[in-house]
């Protein structure tokens, strides 16, 4: 990724990373609104959540949100050399495949990520920032998809 795009990503992430749980909850609220069929994939100790709200208030799911935000943070930190995260992201892809996540669902996750960024950043979420984040997310999903492909 080119330096101007990397800077847009880092600058915008600074605002988000001040409240990762709050913004991660926005991301997953949007995800469940767009693709409710994902909710049953989140089960902890055999517990099936009855609603997105039930899931989003669960301590176990809040821990999942924290982990997702840490993965995004790692991608932002390594935005100019994502190859250093390739094996980790492929392993993450395998783990998601193992619990029943469809690769196609990651496009909805991407939409939810952009939604969260827009809500957090307001007018600072410019078209250039949107494009930069779309490129970063696309690279992350490409690396994770190797976990589906078994590469």
From Swiss-Prot:
Known tissue expression: Widely distributed throughout the adult brain, including cerebral cortex, hippocampus, thalamus, hypothalamus, olfactory bulb, and cerebellum.
GO molecular function: GDP-dissociation inhibitor activity; heme binding; metal ion binding; nitrite reductase activity; oxygen binding; oxygen carrier activity
Post-translational modification: Phosphorylated during hypoxia by ERK1/ERK2. Phosphorylation regulates the heme pocket hexacoordination preventing the association of His-64 with the heme metal center. Thereby, promotes the access of dioxygen and nitrite to the heme and stimulates the nitrite reductase activity. Phosphorylation during hypoxia is stabilized by 14-3-3 proteins.
Residue span(s) of domain Globin: 1-149
Catalytic activity: Fe(III)-heme b-[protein] + nitric oxide + H2O = Fe(II)-heme b-[protein] + nitrite + 2 H(+)
Enzyme Commission number(s) of this protein: 1.7.-.-
InterPro entries: Globin, Globin-like_OT, Globin-like_sf, Globin/Proto
GO BP term, example: cellular response to hypoxia
Keyword vocabulary terms for this entry: Cytoplasm, Disulfide bond, Heme, Iron, Metal-binding, Mitochondrion, Oxidoreductase
Function per UniProt: Monomeric globin with a bis-histidyl six-coordinate heme-iron atom through which it can bind dioxygen, carbon monoxide and nitric oxide. Could help transport oxygen and increase its availability to the metabolically active neuronal tissues, though its low quantity in tissues as well as its high affinity for dioxygen, which may limit its oxygen-releasing ability, argue against it. The ferrous/deoxygenated form exhibits a nitrite reductase activity and it could produce nitric oxide which in turn inhibits cellular respiration in response to hypoxia.
Subunit annotation: Monomer. Homodimer and homotetramer; disulfide-linked. Mainly monomeric but also detected as part of homodimers and homotetramers. Interacts with 14-3-3 proteins; regulates the phosphorylation of NGB. Could interact (ferrous form) with G-alpha(i) proteins (GTP-bound form).
Family affiliation: Belongs to the globin family.
Name by which UniProt lists this protein: Neuroglobin
Organism, scientific name: Rattus norvegicus (Rat)
Taxon lineage: Eukaryota, Metazoa, Chordata, Craniata, Vertebrata
Gene name of this polypeptide: Ngb
């Amino acid at each position: 990724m080119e330096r101007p795009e990397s800077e847009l990503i880092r600058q915008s992430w600074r605002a988000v990373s001040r409240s990762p749980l709050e913004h991660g909850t926005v991301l997953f609220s949007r995800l469940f609104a767009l693709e409710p069929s994902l909710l049953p994939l989140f089960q902890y100790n055999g517990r099936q959540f009855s609603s997105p709200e039930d899931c989003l208030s669960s301590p176990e799911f809040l821990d999942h949100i924290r982990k997702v935000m840490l993965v995004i943070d790692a991608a932002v930190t390594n935005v100019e050399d994502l190859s250093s995260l390739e094996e980790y992201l492929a392993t993450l892809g395998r783990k998601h495949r193992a619990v029943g996540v469809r690769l196609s669902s990651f496009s909805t996750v991407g939409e939810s990520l952009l939604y969260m960024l827009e809500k957090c950043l307001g007018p600072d979420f410019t078209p250039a920032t949107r494009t930069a984040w779309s490129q970063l997310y696309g690279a992350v999903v490409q690396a994770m998809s190797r976990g589906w492909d078994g590469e």
